[in-house]
Amino acid sequence: KVDIRNQYVETVIEKFAPDYVYHFAGWVSIYDCNADPYEAVDNNILGSINVMNGCVKANVKRIIFSETSAVYENCKMSDDGYNETQSDPTTIYSTTKACLALLAESYQRTKGLNYTALRYFNVAGPLQDYHRTVPPVFAGFILRIMGGHNPIVFGDYKKSRDYINVADVNAFHILCMENEETANQTFNLGTGKMTNLLDLKNLI
């Protein structure tokens, strides 16, 4: 176990010299990132640079990392969904992730480190982290309902999101490693189906 903000992570990666590196470490709470931009940058950008430097030193075949669909915050969705070339983040969190994607492209061009970027939509499933300042929707709803309370909604129940099961996400993680055609590509990970908060509440 090592903190990616510590440059020692470069030594660890170089020592074990894996063929592939999955990089999912970082700050994921929009609210925490907005409250402390320094920590957000330290974790999501500077920490990621340490990981990528380690990958370069170890001649890793490819780094597969988590970006976010939040980079589409200010983009207009077409009938076919969001295009992976789009990016217009508005929060500190999504901006750090957009920077990470640009860094990965730069490392590929200048240092030969191949990558696969994964833009997750709303991932749900077992072991979801509910300890954040504001829990993810699924976990937050379940906690409230189990406690005998109505779920808390910021805004209205008409808000719709694309929810994807963590098992499907993990299956794609493996596919990325096994299929070299995913190298130096960016993928949206979602179902393409929107569910509003009222339907989600009734489902739970």
What positions do the PLM features span?
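Catalytic helix-loop patch of NAD(P)-dependent Rossmann-fold dehydrogenases
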Residues: 35-50, 57, 62, 71-117, ...
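NAD(P)H-binding glycine-rich loop region in Rossmannoid oxidoreductase-like domains
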Residues: 5-43
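Protein kinase-like catalytic domain
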Residues: 56, 108, 146, 177-178
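Hydrophobic alpha-helix immediately C-terminal to the catalytic Tyr-X-X-X-Lys motif of short-chain
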Residues: 99, 103, 107, 137, ...
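Active-site loop of short-chain dehydrogenase/reductase
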Residues: 59-63, 112-114, 150, 156, ...
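Glycine/proline-rich active-site loop of Rossmann-fold NAD(P)-dependent oxidoreductases
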Residues: 98, 123-139, 149, 154, ...
